[in-house]
Amino acid sequence: MKKAASIVMAAFLALALSACGAAKSGEDGKAQSASGNATEKYTFGTDATYPPFEFQKDGKYVGIDIDLMNAIAKEEGFDVEIKPMDFKGIIPAITANQLDGAIAGISITDERKKVVDFSDPYYQAGLSLIVNEDNNDIKSPEDLNGKTIAIKKGTSGANLADQYAKTYGATIKYFDDSPSMYQEVANKNADATLEDFPVISYKIAIDPNAKLKIVGDRLNGDFYGIAVAKGDTELQKKINDGLKKLQENGEYDKIVEKYLGSAAK
């Protein structure tokens, strides 16, 4: 009997501990509001090597995209977790349900819209052609014949570089992040790169050793959007509603000006 009683007691304790663990897990998974109702928490991917939109400073993720996503979450009453990763893996992670969405200077393209949905556009970027500061031979894409283009994988710049390779006979060298492709051009191991205008403008402005310059006009007029899983209209609406409020109350402008100044909006 004592043995049976011990077994029953052990089972009871195990069940109680299991229940406590489950409750703790639930608390970790969702934040509790003051009213006791659970707050939705979404995980968003980003590429933390893309200043001024997302980068690390003093051990924290900051930038236009990070501040904007946090402000939208605050407006709409949900929590957000930022998960850094390589840019090329962001869209696949959304389609594999490993992320709820992503904000990473992602250009809205027809190809991407086949697999994810986007928020309303929140920033017009546009690609620029960048060369070493000593290079006076390349002034436009037509001058890329026989030249080498350094480019980051999975970007709209990579798509345009591929077109230039076919049209002008350029060679492409791929990289996983923007700093690596910048350095390749700075070291004169590649002749040019393609980057979003606000991003490269920021890089050149804050880095006296960049050894880069922009040549010619903007090559296109890409718009950035916040990506969500295909068909997730609920999250898409929350983002659009929050973004609209921030644009109307002036907070959006404050975020952009914080990193780029009013002239760069």
Each language-model region and where it sits:
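Extracytoplasmic small-molecule ligand-binding "clamshell" domains
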Residues: 29-105
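Ligand-binding cleft/hinge of the Venus flytrap
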Residues: 56, 69-78, 157-175, 204-208
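A ligand-binding cleft/hinge motif common to bilobed small-molecule-binding domains
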Residues: 106-114, 162-163, 186-187, 191-221
